[in-house]
Amino acid sequence: MTRHVRPVLFLAFVVAAASYTSGAGQALPPGEHPAGFADAVLGRWDLTVEGVEGPYPSWLLIHMRKDTQLQANFVGRFGSVRSATLTDFDNGQLTVVIPVQYEQQKTDLKFIGKVVGDKLEGTTEDEKGRTVKWTGARAPASTTTKPVNWGAPIQLLNQGDLTGWRQRSTAKGICWSVADGVLTNKTPCADLITEKTFTDFKLHVELMFPPKSNSGVYLRGRYEVQIQDDAGKPVDSHRMGGVYGFIAPYTNATKPADEWQAYDITLIGRRVTVVLNGTTIIDNEIIPGITGGAIDSREGDPGPLMLQGDHGKISFRNITLTPSL
């Protein structure tokens, strides 16, 4: 993925036409509301959209632009985080308008919803203009307060077959294979997912890609650490070592293409540390939410390790995961 949006600049603007009156009887400017008007919708929301071809995940962060205005940030089923162009909560109705990124629509995405108990519920339109339902659950806290005890390391890859793994889709046939302990895809391909799921863990994985290729490692199947041919380039959250669209690496430790490289990644709650080729490039940073391409948005659940296989040629070896107890 190559669209470049700086990860932490969560900026949006609100356009609304309604005028309100404050408790002092003074009219508020258009687009503004009394303080505290949107407390029920503020925060991080894990969305599930009930698409016609099956459910898919999205993510929404609603926060204050100022006391009387809202702004929002959104992650769809693919792509990276983007800012909404309109965010409003009026008479119990939430409206979020989001610019198209990789979707096929010719008009902006529009999510309409309301608070139902401790959830959000609403509708949007799919790429063919069909109305579909969506629900939102509040995302869990970023990390655990308990000390982590580590179990025994697990070798996730054997020497000769795909035992313990499954393809996300077989529409293009079986496109992953293992030979002499090296896992390789043939393009076009699909993502590869472990049968086992994990909560907190330490991961070691070695990888190699040809020039201009692209892949990724999805932690719990939800948070992509980017793999890309980016040696010598300025750092960015969309480039090698970044948590896609959210967290840029501190430095570029990428080797040239066609060389074996190594990730050592620790994930505890939503806090992540990434070591690339022996250099710490992300240290105990909080991942705001799911990244595009995630398997689901259930951030509080254990999840698998997923290797991205639908973007380019990639090889992996020595995949070792140490789970928490």
Descriptions of predicted regions:
Residues 21-27:
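Boundary at the C-terminal end of the N-terminal hydrophobic targeting segment
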